[in-house]
Design a protein with these regions (language model features):
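N-terminal signal-anchor/start-transfer transmembrane helix
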Residues: 11-29
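Generic alpha-helical transmembrane segments
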Residues: 13-17, 46-51, 70-87
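Glycine-rich, aromatic-bearing surface loops/beta-hairpins
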Residues: 117-170
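Hydrophobic alpha-helical membrane segments
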Residues: 78-82, 101-122
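Juxtamembrane helix-loop boundaries in multi-pass membrane proteins
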Residues: 3, 7-8, 30-53, 96-112, ...
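Membrane-helix exit/interface motif
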Residues: 24-27, 51-65, 84-92
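Hydrophobic alpha-helical transmembrane segments in multi-pass integral membrane proteins
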Residues: 51-60, 111-128
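Non-cytosolic membrane-interface motifs at loop->transmembrane helix junctions
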Residues: 65-73, 98-102, 130-140
Length: 170
C-alpha cells in the first residue's frame, strides 16, 4: 500500500509543482513587485517540492528506515521553518493577503507531526492507531498536498491588485 501511495504522491507532487511554475510565470509581472506574493508563491512551490521529495526518498529507502526518517525529519523542519518565517512577515501584507496567509497555519501541526513521526516511528501505535510509520506519514502528506493545492488555488484565483494597492504594500 505505502509503495503505491508514494509512487502516486511523488508523481502528483512534481506534476503540480510544474503546473504551479506555469501559474507563477503567468502572474510574474504582478507578483514580482509584491514581496509577500513572492513569499506565498514560494510557499506553494515548497508544499509540492517537499511532499514529492519525501515520497521519492521513501521509495528509495528500501530496508533502511533511517533514510526516510532523516529525509522526512529534514523536510518537516524546512516546511515548519518556512511557515514560521512567512508568519513573521504577515504584518507587512494587505488585509486580503493576510486571510490567505493565515490558512497556512493549518500546516504547521502537520509539518511538526512529520518530524515527530520521523523521530519516533511508533508514535501512531503508541496512541492506539494501528498504522505502520510510512502509512501514518502518508496520511499527513495527503493532507499537506490537499492544503497546498487549495492554497495554490486561492493565490491563482486572487484578482490582480490595483497599482496603488501594490505600491502601499511595499
Amino acid at each position: 500500500m505505502a509503495q503505491t501511495f508514494y509512487e502516486t504522491a511523488a508523481l502528483a507532487a512534481f506534476a503540480l509543482l510544474g503546473l504551479w511554475w506555469v501559474v507563477v510565470a503567468d502572474r510574474r509581472r504582478e507578483w514580482a513587485r509584491l514581496p509577500y506574493r513572492r513569499r506565498q508563491a514560494y510557499s506553494v512551490s515548497l508544499y509540492f517540492a517537499l511532499t514529492g521529495t519525501m515520497s521519492l526518498v521513501s521509495l528509495n529507502s528500501g530496508s533502511h528506515p533511517a533514510i526516510w526518517r532523516t529525509a522526512f525529519g529534514i523536510a518537516g523542519v524546512i516546511g515548519a521553518a518556512e511557515l514560521v518565517l512567512s508568519l513573521v512577515y504577515i504584518g507587512a501584507e494587505p488585509p486580503r493577503a493576510k486571510r490567505i496567509q493565515w490558512l497556512l497555519t493549518l500546516t504547521l501541526p502537520l509539518y511538526l507531526l512529520i518530524v515527530a513521526i520521523a523521530i519516533q516511528p511508533s508514535l501512531a501505535r503508541d496512541v492506539g492507531i494501528h498504522l505502520k510509520p510510512l502509512e501514518t506519514e502518508a496520511i499527513v502528506i495527503s493532507l499537506l498536498l490537499f492544503l497546498g493545492i487549495n492554497y495554490g488555488w486561492l493565490l491563482f484565483m486572487e484578482p490582480a491588485y490595483a497599482a496603488a494597492e501594490s505600491e502601499e504594500s511595499e
